[in-house]
Each structure stands twice: as C-alpha cells, then as structure tokens.
Swiss-Prot record:
The lineage of its organism: Bacteria, Pseudomonadati, Thermodesulfobacteriota, Desulfobacteria, Desulfobacterales. Its EC number is 2.1.1.-. The gene is prmA. It catalyses: L-lysyl-[protein] + 3 S-adenosyl-L-methionine = N(6),N(6),N(6)-trimethyl-L-lysyl-[protein] + 3 S-adenosyl-L-homocysteine + 3 H(+). It comes from Desulfatibacillum aliphaticivorans. This is Ribosomal protein L11 methyltransferase. InterPro entries: Ribosomal_L11_MeTrfase_PrmA (IPR050078), Ribosomal_PrmA_MeTrfase (IPR004498), SAM-dependent_MTases_sf (IPR029063). One of its GO terms (biological process) is methylation. Belongs to the methyltransferase superfamily. PrmA family. One of its GO terms (cellular component) is cytoplasm.
C-alpha cells in the first residue's frame, strides 16, 4: 500500500500546545506513524511523546494517511479542522504532501517510545525495553504497532490518573472503555482492581490489538470482553459501575445521553480527549443528563472530567 506523507509546518504563540492539538487532530483523521519536530530537537513516536535528538529548525507535525478510497475525504476534513485552529491556536500553517512507501517509518517510532510513569502506581513500558521498578509500580506493557496509541499522550495520562483515583476509592466490578484502541485503559483498570473489563471500538484492527495487549498483560480471557461498534452500539450488557471514554469532546457529547442505559446508579463516568476550549460542551451534556461533576483536571490544554450518575 502507498501512503501520503502530510507535513504540517506551523507558527503559534504556544507551540507546545499547538503541537499537541495538531498531532491529536491528524490521528483523529486516520493518520499513522506520527512525527513531531521542534526547533533544536525532534522526537518520533506514535502519539507525540518520547526522547529527542538535535535536528529540527521548525515546528511541524508529520503523519501518513493511506492512499485509499477514503483519502480525499480525510484530507478535506483535516484541512477544515486545521482552519478551525487558525487564529486561536495557530497563527499560521502550511501543509506539504509527498507519496511514500510504509517500510521506512513502519518501526522507526519504536526508538522513541520509553517507559512513562502515570499517577502514583502505574508505569507504561514498551515490550522491548527493561524497566527498573524500585517503587513496585504496576506495569502496563504494550507493543501497540503503528496504528494505536502508546499511552503517553496527555489525554491518556489524564484518563488513567482519574481511573486510578476512582479505583483507590472503590475498584469497579465492571469497567467499560469506549473507543478502546490499544486497550490501555482496560489494562490499567484491571491492574487497579477492576474485576471485569470491557471495551468497544469501531475498528476491528484496534480490537485485535487490544485483545493481544490484554492477554500480554495477564488479563484473563474470562475477565474481559470486546465489542465492535460506534460508541455504545452493540453493547447489550449493562450495569457498568465505571465507564471511561478517551475520545473527542464532540464524541463524548454524543455518547453521554446513552450512558444511563448501561451504567449502574451512582456509578462514575470519566471523559477525556477534550480540548480545554470545548470542555463546556461536555459539562453541559453531563448536566442535561443529571450527572454530578466531581472533578475536572486540565493538563497541557486537555481536560478530563469525572462525573457521577444519579
């Protein structure tokens, strides 16, 4: 398969925030093999974090879209999304296109995916690296491949930290991750004491990667379940006492009205993947469904929200 390399070069008053938001947008529009550069350094990883080497003279985000029947639509949607950031997050930007084969970048991101500690008790590490663990943290070991997050993006870190906080109060009997991707939130919840963990995603490749990662992290087959579908479509089992969704603000707004059908009374919902300027959209949707907001956490321009069902 051929791929289109898309390089977005930009100027911004807050370049780190802009870089995170642009990288998140391109991943949301189906991009893979993400690379981010900053003047004086560069770092290549799946979701924008990791080590760096002296190299770049510009702020940029480079990613790859498959040259398939969906390419033109994705390209147009991404252009509109970038235009929405201009004037607020971005002062200016340009986009450059180049056809590429996938082999040169298929595994290059691995060199920059290193262990990262999350919260008080978790650490995410790649399967190919060793990790000294004097604090006896619970290990989440991933080999996510190109298409799924390594867990180092701020939205994932915020979500895992909030899951940890709630699990320390009371670990759930039944945990659900909406848009599970690599399965990292399911694994984290299980390590933190959840008895049964479930996940849904609209991408079969994601579900296959999640199943592999769950088994690789000693989550017993009888303790997890995976569904294919958008948001809550296809989920017939209810009474979850913790639900997490690390998706966009707009997707969270669409998700929230359906939550009372599948959540137990008094259960907790954790929403992440929310740009700070869009948090009110999610807060309003929660209020309309009578959720009580218990915590709002912001990191690097991204927001996580914990809210309780009535």
């Amino acid at each position: 398969m051929q791929w289109m390399e898309i390089k977005i070069v930009f100027d911004a008053a807050e370049p780190e925030l802009a870089q995170e938001m642009v990288s998140y947008l391109v991943m949301e529009h189906g991009a893979e093999g993400l690379e981010m550069t900053t003047p004086g350094e560069t770092g290549m990883v799946q979701d924008g974090s990791g080590s760096s080497v002296p190299d770049s003279k510009e702020h940029s985000v480079t990613a790859f879209l498959p040259l398939d029947d969906l390419f033109e639509g994705r390209k147009a949607d991404l252009t509109r999304a970038l235009d929405d950031l201009k004037g607020s997050v971005l002062t200016d930007y340009s986009v450059h296109f180049s056809k590429q084969d996938d082999q040169p970048w298929e595994t290059a991101w691995k060199a920059h995916f290193h262990p990262i500690e999350i919260g008080e008790s978790l650490v995410i590490k790649p399967s190919w690296e060793d990790y000294e663990n004097p604090e006896k943290r619970m290990l989440i070991e991933l080999d996510p491949g190109m298409a799924f997050g390594t867990g180092t993006h701020p939205t994932t870190a915020v979500c895992l930290e909030m899951i940890e906080t709630e699990c320390l109060k009371k670990a759930p009997e039944r945990f659900l991750d909406v848009g599970t991707g690599s399965g990292i939130l399911m694994i984290g919840a299980y390590k933190l004491g959840a008895r049964k963990v479930f996940g849904c995603d609209n991408d079969m490749d994601a579900l296959e990667a999640a199943a592999k990662n769950l088994k690789g992290n000693q989550v017993h087959e009888g303790d997890f379940g995976l569904w294919l579908g958008d948001l809550l479509a296809g989920i017939v089992e209810g009474a979850f006492d913790m639900v997490a969704a690390n998706i966009t603000a707009e997707a969270n707004v669409m998700l929230i009205p359906g939550l009372p059908r599948i959540m137990a009374p008094g259960s907790i919902f954790i929403a992440s993947g929310i740009m700070a300027e869009k948090k009110d959209l999610v807060l309003e949707a929660l209020d309309a469904c009578r959720f009580s907001v218990e915590r709002v956490q912001e990191t690097g321009g991204w927001v996580g929200i914990a809210a309780r069902m009535p």
